Each structure stands twice: as structure tokens, then as C-alpha cells.
């Protein structure tokens, strides 16, 4: 049991270090990330739709 407690303590210590180094993104960075995410969702949706259309055309159903 002490080993588990030590692992949990180390995890929180490392997590605290990460939070101290990171920073909150600015508005421009947020907009860029949102655009890239939206574009990725759109591309994945289009690929799925194309696969579905090809399947319908090949299998007739």
C-alpha cells in the first residue's frame, strides 16, 4: 500500500509541474485550433460519405 501512495504522490507532483509550465491559450490560438478541428471533422465526414456512396454504388443497396 505505501508503494501505491508514493506513486499517487509522484503523479500529483509531476502534474503540478506540468500545470506550472503550461499557459492558457490566447483568443487567436483558440480560433486557430477551432478552425483546424472543424476542418478535420469535415474531412473525416466527407471521407465517410464517399465510402458510403461507393459502397452503395458497388453493392447496389
Curated annotation (Swiss-Prot):
Pfam families assigned: SecE
GO MF, any single term: protein transmembrane transporter activity
Subcellular location field: Cell membrane
Major localization listed first in the record, in broad terms: membrane
Membrane topology qualifier: Single-pass membrane protein
GO CC list: plasma membrane
Listed GO biological process terms: intracellular protein transmembrane transport; protein secretion; protein targeting
Classification via Gene3D superfamilies: Preprotein translocase SecE subunit
Keywords: Cell membrane, Membrane, Protein transport, Translocation, Transmembrane, Transmembrane helix, Transport
Organism domain of life: Archaea
Protein family per UniProt: Belongs to the SecE/SEC61-gamma family.
Subunit and interaction comment: Component of the Sec protein translocase complex. Heterotrimer consisting of SecY (alpha), SecG (beta) and SecE (gamma) subunits. The heterotrimers can form oligomers, although 1 heterotrimer is thought to be able to translocate proteins. Interacts with the ribosome. May interact with SecDF, and other proteins may be involved.
Name assigned to this protein: Protein translocase subunit SecE
Organism: Pyrococcus horikoshii (strain ATCC 700860 / DSM 12428 / JCM 9974 / NBRC 100139 / OT-3)
The organism's taxonomic lineage, starting at the top: Archaea, Methanobacteriati, Methanobacteriota, Thermococci, Thermococcales
Amino acid at each position: 500500500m505505501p508503494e501505491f501512495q508514493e506513486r499517487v504522490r509522484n503523479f500529483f507532483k509531476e502534474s503540478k509541474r506540468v500545470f506550472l509550465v503550461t499557459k492558457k491559450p490566447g483568443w487567436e490560438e483558440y480560433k486557430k485550433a477551432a478552425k483546424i478541428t472543424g476542418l478535420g471533422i469535415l474531412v473525416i465526414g466527407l471521407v465517410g460519405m464517399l465510402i458510403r456512396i461507393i459502397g452503395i454504388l458497388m453493392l447496389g443497396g
